[in-house]
């Protein structure tokens, strides 16, 4: 099973090296790594080129202007030749060197279309400090209707499923992942598996955790849930927020 991992990047010189190194360090042998940079104006491109030196046989790298993260990810998906698509955002890094190996083992055992797992949010400056602990839990379709979704960077999805069910809607600036996940998990009736292991470390302060973006996220989430006919739509959004509360409590005991 070939896995294509996509990293989108724009002006992330402080964090991109860690993200790239964490993917290149994976012990799973059949990984295609795709890095899509949006013509960064800082030193991101130089750092990427330096980090991937010697790994050109497994890395595809492009740098060109785009209209945001979701366009970049869609470019990467269209470039991908793997059986499975996964993401490692430029602010994040893989949890361990054997993460992909564990994911593939579970996907092969379950013959699933869509796998999700657990993840942790860490302090932006001190990545050893855990801020939130995201435990995905067992999948149930009704939970999606009640605002639950898996943590986006923990998702590993069959590429043929993505091409059939649709890629990221680029009209969204923040909630295209919410839209895609609701579509896949509520509408597409996929075979879903849950891996009860941490697979990613995410820095707080990313696009979906930045307080300055929360109003826009609220509006975009309402648009998503309205589009799928979830009523009352505001209650669904509030329940989505409520699912996050236990994560902060669990983090205190890590």
Model-assigned labels for residue ranges:
Residues 226-254:
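Membrane-proximal basic amphipathic "stem/tether" segments
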Residues 210-235:
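Catalytic core of nucleotide-sugar-dependent glycosyltransferases
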Residues 1-213, 253:
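Nucleotide-sugar donor-binding/catalytic module of glycosyltransferases
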